[in-house]
Regions:
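The feature captures the catalytic groove of carbohydrate-active enzymes
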Residues: 1-49, 53-117
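Non-catalytic C-terminal accessory modules of carbohydrate-active enzymes
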Residues: 46, 126-239
Length: 239
């Protein structure tokens, strides 16, 4: 059976809406800065500060837990920089603990793209790689075990017996794991303050689960390649 014994996680729309309100405002502030629109940058930066304060008041408990206490909640709060500095590490630990507890992803359309990024950024690479390599439902590799050659809309669009279940068989959403593969596994990341990958940082997150990783990103300034492999004496990284 593809069924999990997990009853389901629900992150309410008020939490998600506020998180994305903050993220949208953050992007506007960044765009204004890049375009040299100082008045707009200041306006959106001040709005972002107020949104963060309201978010923390409404959704962060006194002991640092989030309400709702779901993987998606922790992923969005950490990815969008919505938590006070002093509780971020603990929040990331709670996320990692939840992943370990259930052994699989419980995020939906909005939390899935960033969960492995957040885990890796806070030192929980083992949990991120665990999610990548899991072959039982729900996971990225379960579809491969039943012959998938595309990314599906739902984790179980085809059941183990080969019957069609639900959803599109060619859908972009879960392909978001590709960002983590490029930016954390291969380690190709844009430097802070840079635009269009003019300046880059190469910082792979190594694992004993892989013997090598290789990726190339074609930026407007030219191709950026990272290749690491395990050897008898350690690791080799070619950039």
């Amino acid at each position: 059976s593809t069924a999990s014994d997990y009853p389901g996680a629900f992150t309410d729309k008020e939490f998600v809406g506020t998180a994305y309100f903050a993220r949208s405002t953050q992007l506007l502030a960044q765009a204004a800065q890049i375009l040299g629109k100082e008045e707009d940058r200041k306006t959106y930066s001040e709005l972002l500060s107020r949104i963060k304060q309201s978010f923390q008041k409404e959704f962060v408990t006194r002991n640092g837990r989030l309400s709702p206490n779901t993987q998606t909640a922790y992923v969005l709060a950490l990815s969008f920089d919505l938590l006070p500095e002093d509780i971020r590490k603990d929040a990331a630990q709670r996320l990692a603990d939840d992943v370990r507890k259930f052994g699989h992803i419980t995020t939906g359309f909005l939390g899935t793209p960033e969960i492995c990024n957040v885990l890796s950024d806070y030192g929980h690479d083992d949990e991120a790689y665990m999610l990548l390599f899991r072959k039982k439902f729900p996971s990225w590799l379960y579809p491969v075990t039943v012959g998938a050659t595309t990314v599906w809309e739902s984790w179980d669009a085809i059941l183990p017996d080969g019957t069609f279940n639900k959803g599109s068989l060619n859908h972009f959403a879960y392909g978001a794991i590709g960002d983590w593969l490029f930016s954390r596994v291969a380690g190709i990341r844009q430097a802070e303050g840079s635009t269009a990958y003019k300046e880059i940082v190469i910082k792979p997150h190594f694992t004993t689960s892989l013997s090598f990783a290789r990726a190339t990103y074609y930026s407007m300034y030219g191709p950026i390649s990272s290749h690491w492999q395990r050897t008898d004496t350690g690791l080799e990284l070619h950039v």
